[in-house]
């Protein structure tokens, strides 16, 4: 026996080993329980951010719900029914006042055209249930007795069904079942509000419209997302039938819109289901989702959850983002910060579908390759067989703008996860895992995730195709770096709660569930170990597909390998860089080396090196350290221009001799933004002076994307040719704060003065624009500071919260 071979004194070793193994089994069970509790806490959410109100689970092909509404005092406005968030809607500021993905929150929509202010409170309740409270208040200036029609709908995308039923009290509700959710019921409860009176007709007496209207329709599941189009078609058809029957010649002859534009009360066992409510003046009702096996939800429970959500949010915000002077005294600054962060967190979406992928790289490996003037039609490429519909995939992500960009963007996401990771570490890791699950066998991830027909409906045809050699700045590494920094900060501070000797924990404690991957060393190591192969594959894809050409054009530099070029340039754009129309070499050339891409690759390498060391991957760590050193050397050899005193792109002239292509701006500053320069560097001194020069990049509102002295400043599309972007200003401030203002040396004082003044300029400008308009903008004018382009852009513009709290 093994025990005999060990000897008497060593039997205790065997006993200890068995005890350890038993403990591991118990720990494993605990980890599974914790992961289930964590996943359950963010299973449901407003994960259809392209809609004003859309609740679904984080499950592919499952239950989809949404809310639509319109004023029905007349027929004209009904055609502009609210459903999907549209850039051109006559809606003022809309979005979340407070929101937490594990609890819920409150959204406010000022609908000027419909004359109504909608407050929607989404709350998560015990046993996985949820409720949506809808409160409508006539806006100032609108009739206090205006009539509003609202449609709540539900359908199942995959296996399962949902139907409408009527109980003995003549109350309509929905009931359904799916493999993932089991049996469930959705009910609505009117809490406040009067109802219009339908006019008398030949057949019916006038009556108060206090009952819900309802109907179910069998539609193809792949087209069920066109919900508002279906309702508009059906009720428009009903209106025409009535007109023909009664001989009405104009809309003026018709009965009031609120009495005509109603559903026919047809129950259905499956398909797309609607419950319609019609109110006069102010109203409130609850929509309640209940699992069949759980207790019923009361009005009081919903009200208490709403109040608790607000209280918990305010306390959590103060603990995570305590605002620093001069933003720590005024209530307005606090509301502003709450709104900015909530609308980032409320932009989370879960998407499933296929994408259109080109069969060939955009740049063929061909000596006769010519750079394109623009991009090709997706429909055309599909028709000619040069593109295909890739397999269906799912993505959990944060979208930059609900009305304009309701889909996943690779380079935006790294910025999105910086504040989210501070609030809820483990939730940010869920999104990281979701993105890296998209890494294909070659290591590629599409820069835009346009998954399915609903997502494609928001994207121009020429931008729908994804090319397997087009990259994007690898900003997800910023989020991973943030996680690593939190790990370092917590090492040695927290006991391992799984050892049986640590603190007690409860699976109902959301604060605990937010940070399991920090407090539990086993889980943190496992997360990084699972991610590391995907990171490496993705990294090697960058190295291979974006490598510069050192064979055709030799350079005098440390390494004949470490130089990179964004693929997919056109004459006017370099979409892969994320900086679209930022000036590059003209004409485009395969000889180019892009300084911003080398900077991103150096940062990518540095973070991967840390992960390799953390995991004990010594050989990989040594290789990465060698890459990083070569990259830093080549950054100086190939990209520093002594005359211009800036980092520049590199290309060749008509004689094939190397030249620098210098356009001072964000590209120039990126080595400093990513903390690649030593604190005592003379190069840093030059960049700091460039930043502070009012004739170049400095403005009272933030750092401009391109120098005012550049020939391309403010020209053409003028997207990245001067306008101020908050994500890039964040990188400047973050790097100054973390790397330079507290390090003694020749640059410390200048770095500190720039940091203090720039922080105030950026925050004050974003705040002032929000105070005047209630809107967070995509970018800000470089000469006036006025917000412009996409409104309701609460993606990386929300980094203003990190800046206010100096939480980098």
From Swiss-Prot:
Q: What's the protein here called?
A: Probable mannosyl-oligosaccharide glucosidase
Q: Which residues lie on this side of the membrane: Lumenal?
A: 32-808
Q: Which Pfam families match?
A: Glyco_hydro_63, Glyco_hydro_63N
Question: Whose protein is this, by species?
Answer: Schizosaccharomyces pombe (strain 972 / ATCC 24843)
Functionally, this protein is described as follows: Cleaves the distal alpha 1,2-linked glucose residue from the Glc(3)Man(9)GlcNAc(2) oligosaccharide precursor highly specifically.
Enzyme type, top EC level: hydrolase
Q: Does the keyword Hydrolase apply?
A: yes
What does the UniProt entry say about where the protein is found?
Endoplasmic reticulum membrane
- What is annotated as the active site? 580, 778
């Amino acid at each position: 026996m093994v025990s005999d071979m060990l000897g008497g004194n060593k039997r205790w070793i065997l006993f200890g080993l068995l005890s350890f193994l038993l403990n591991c089994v118990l720990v494993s069970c605990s980890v599974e329980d914790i992961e289930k509790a964590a996943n359950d806490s963010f299973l449901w959410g407003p994960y259809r951010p392209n809609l004003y109100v859309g609740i679904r689970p984080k499950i592919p092909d499952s239950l989809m719900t949404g809310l639509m509404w319109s004023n029905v005092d007349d027929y004209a406005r009904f055609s502009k029914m609210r459903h999907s968030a549209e850039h051109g809607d006559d809606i003022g500021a809309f979005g979340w006042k407070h929101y937490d993905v594990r609890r819920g929150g409150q959204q406010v929509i000022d609908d000027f055209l419909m004359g109504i202010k909608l407050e929607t409170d989404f709350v998560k309740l015990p046993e996985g249930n949820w409720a949506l409270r809808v409160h409508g208040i006539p806006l100032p200036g609108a009739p206090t007795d205006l009539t509003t029609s609202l449609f709540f709908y539900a359908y199942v995308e995959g296996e399962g069904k949902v139907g409408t039923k009527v109980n003995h009290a003549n109350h309509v509700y929905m009931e359904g079942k799916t493999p993932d959710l089991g049996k469930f019921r959705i009910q609505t409860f009117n809490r406040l509000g009067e109802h219009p009176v339908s006019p008398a007709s030949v057949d019916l007496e006038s009556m108060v419209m206090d009952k819900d209207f309802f109907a179910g329709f069998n539609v193809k599941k792949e087209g069920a997302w066109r919900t508002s189009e279906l309702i508009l078609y059906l009720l428009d058809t009903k209106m025409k039938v009535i007109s023909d029957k009664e001989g009405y010649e104009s809309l003026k002859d018709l009965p009031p819109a609120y009495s005509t534009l109603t559903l026919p009360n047809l129950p259905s066992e499956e398909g797309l289901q609607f419950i319609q409510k019609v109110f006069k003046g102010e109203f409130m009702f609850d929509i309640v989702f209940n699992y069949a096996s759980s207790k019923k939800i009361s009005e009081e429970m919903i009200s208490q959850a709403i109040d608790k959500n607000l209280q918990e949010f305010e306390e959590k915000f103060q603990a995570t983002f305590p605002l620093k002077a001069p933003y720590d005294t005024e209530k307005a600054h606090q509301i502003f910060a709450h709104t900015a962060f909530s609308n980032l967190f409320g932009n989370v979406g879960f998407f499933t579908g296929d994408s259109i992928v080109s069969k060939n790289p955009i740049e063929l490996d061909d000596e006769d390759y010519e750079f394109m003037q623009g991009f090709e039609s997706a429909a055309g490429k599909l028709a000619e067989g040069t593109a295909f519909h890739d397999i269906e995939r799912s993505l959990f992500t944060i979208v930059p703008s609900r009305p304009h960009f309701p889909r996943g963007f690779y380079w935006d996401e790294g910025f999105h996860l910086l504040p989210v990771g501070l609030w809820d570490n483990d939730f940010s890791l869920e999104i990281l895992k979701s993105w890296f699950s998209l890494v294909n066998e070659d290591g590629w991830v599409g820069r835009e995730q346009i998954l399915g027909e609903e997502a494609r409906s928001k994207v121009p045809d020429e931008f729908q195709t994804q090319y397997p050699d087009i990259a994007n700045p690898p900003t997800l590494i910023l989020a991973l770096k943030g996680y690593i920094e939190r790990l370092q900060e917590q090492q040695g501070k927290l006991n391992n709660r799984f050892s049986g000797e640590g603190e007690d924990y409860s699976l109902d404690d959301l604060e605990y569930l937010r940070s399991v991957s920090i407090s539990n060393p086993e889980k943190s190591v496992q997360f990084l170990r699972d991610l590391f192969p995907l990171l490496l594959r993705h990294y090697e894809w960058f190295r291979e597909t974006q490598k510069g050409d050192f064979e055709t054009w030799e350079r005098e530099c440390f390494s004949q390998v470490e130089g990179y070029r964004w693929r997919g340039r056109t004459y006017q754009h370099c979409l892969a860089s994320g900086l679209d129309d930022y000036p590059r070499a003209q004409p485009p050339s395969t000889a180019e080396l892009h300084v911003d891409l080398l900077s991103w690759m150096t940062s990518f390498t540095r973070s991967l090196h840390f992960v390799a060391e953390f995991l004990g991957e010594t050989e990989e760590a040594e290789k990465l350290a060698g890459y990083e050193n070569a990259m830093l050397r080549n950054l100086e050899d190939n990209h520093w221009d002594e005359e211009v005193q800036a980092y520049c792109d590199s290309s060749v002239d008509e004689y094939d001799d190397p030249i620098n292509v210098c356009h001072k701006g964000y590209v120039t500053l990126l080595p400093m933004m990513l903390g690649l320069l030593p604190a005592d560097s003379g190069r840093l001194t030059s960049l700091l002076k460039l930043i502070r020069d009012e004739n170049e990049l400095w403005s009272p509102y933030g750092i401009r994307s391109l120098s005012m002295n550049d020939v391309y400043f403010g020209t053409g599309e003028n997207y990245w040719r001067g306008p101020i972007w908050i994500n890039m200003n964040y990188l400047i401030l973050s790097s100054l704060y973390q790397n330079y203002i507290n390090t003694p040396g020749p640059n410390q004082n200048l770095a500190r003065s720039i940091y203090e003044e720039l922080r105030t300029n950026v925050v004050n400008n974003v705040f002032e624009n929000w105070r005047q308009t209630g809107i967070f903008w995509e970018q800000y004018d470089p000469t006036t500071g006025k917000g412009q382009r996409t409104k309701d852009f609460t993606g990386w513009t929300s980094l203003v919260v990190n800046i206010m709290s100096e939480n980098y």
